[in-house]
Amino acid sequence: MKNTFVYQAEKPVIKLLQITDPHLFKDESAELLGVNTQASFAQVLKEIQQENNEFDVILATGDLVQDSSDEGYIRFVEMMKPFNKPVFWIPGNHDFQPKMAEFLNQPPMNAAKHLLLGEHWQALLLDSQVYGVPHGQLSQHQLDLLKETLGKNPERYTLVVLHHHLLPTNSAWLDQHNLRNSHELAEVLAPFTNVKAILYGHIHQEVNSEWNGYQVMATPATCIQFKPDCQYFSLDTLQPGWREIELHSDGSIRTEVKRIQQAEFFPNMQEEGY
């Protein structure tokens, strides 16, 4: 996989921060289903910084901007600068990749999709976007890159990162927008015993589960939340959040989802979709 980033660290634990689905707009006052996404994202970042936790790497797992605007991507970059840590990104279904390539190319942003993290771990960032539609699919090119990279680093524990979800949410309206070829992903991963976990966003809710023996993690959006186990489109009153991950030298993972505590953002519960 091209664009390899090497994070040299002799310490036994690598600490990651995942933020996902900010859905920023050109207009800072714009709302998504009743929530000002600029304000909610700013609040998430503020509370992360107040914790004073030292992260090694930040993962931004898609749907960074809702309306393909230059201003949205420029503002995202500016808002990430205070962390002074490399920020790696993947596209979500709402993102416009030409704009991502244009604006997410300056520090702290980094376009690498293969991260060598310390002596024991690697993270592989996959593009599951099918432009113009909500569901996801990994192209044959992405699957081939994944297989090639895993084959070159068989001794490293591996975290696979993408936008779209693998596990059903038990919400019919949302599960039609899943990763359509998860079976092909499973076939590629199967021979590589050091693959430990899969991380994604997209579903605007927390998941800590298992799929084919891999730990599976999904993370709340920094804006609106989708209510699980609902046949029809439903919003939740849970607050915006983020995920912190520790990758240990023995291959184990410790992780925690946190949500904002110092403010409240409530969507318009009467909305029937977006």
Swiss-Prot record:
Q: Which domain of life is it from?
A: Bacteria
Q: What residue ranges are annotated as transmembrane?
A: none
A GO molecular function annotation here is: 3',5'-cyclic-AMP phosphodiesterase activity
The keyword Hydrolase belongs to this UniProt entry's keyword annotation: yes
- At which positions is Fe cation 2 bound? 63, 93, 163, 202
What family name appears in the similarity comment?
Belongs to the cyclic nucleotide phosphodiesterase class-III family.
According to its UniProt entry, the function of this protein is described as: Hydrolyzes cAMP to 5'-AMP. Plays an important regulatory role in modulating the intracellular concentration of cAMP, thereby influencing cAMP-dependent processes. May coordinate responses to nutritional stress, ensuring optimal competence development.
Catalysed reaction(s) here are:
3',5'-cyclic AMP + H2O = AMP + H(+)
Cofactor binding: number and manner: Binds 2 Fe(2+) ions per subunit.
InterPro entries linked: Calcineurin-like_PHP_ApaH (IPR004843), cAMP_phosphodiest_CpdA (IPR046379), CNP_phosphodiesterase-III (IPR050884), GpdQ/CpdA-like (IPR026575), Metallo-depent_PP-like (IPR029052)
Q: What happens when the gene is disrupted?
A: Mutants show increased levels of cellular cAMP.
Q: What is this protein called?
A: 3',5'-cyclic adenosine monophosphate phosphodiesterase CpdA
Residue pairs linked by disulfide bridges in the UniProt entry: none
Q: Which cofactor does it need?
A: Fe(2+)
Q: Where does AMP bind?
A: 23, 63, 93-94, 204
Q: Where does Fe cation 1 bind?
A: 21, 23, 63, 204
Give the top-level enzyme category.
hydrolase
Q: What is its EC number?
A: 3.1.4.53
What's in the keyword line of the UniProt record?
cAMP, Hydrolase, Iron, Metal-binding, Nucleotide-binding
Q: Which organism is it from?
A: Haemophilus influenzae (strain ATCC 51907 / DSM 11121 / KW20 / Rd)
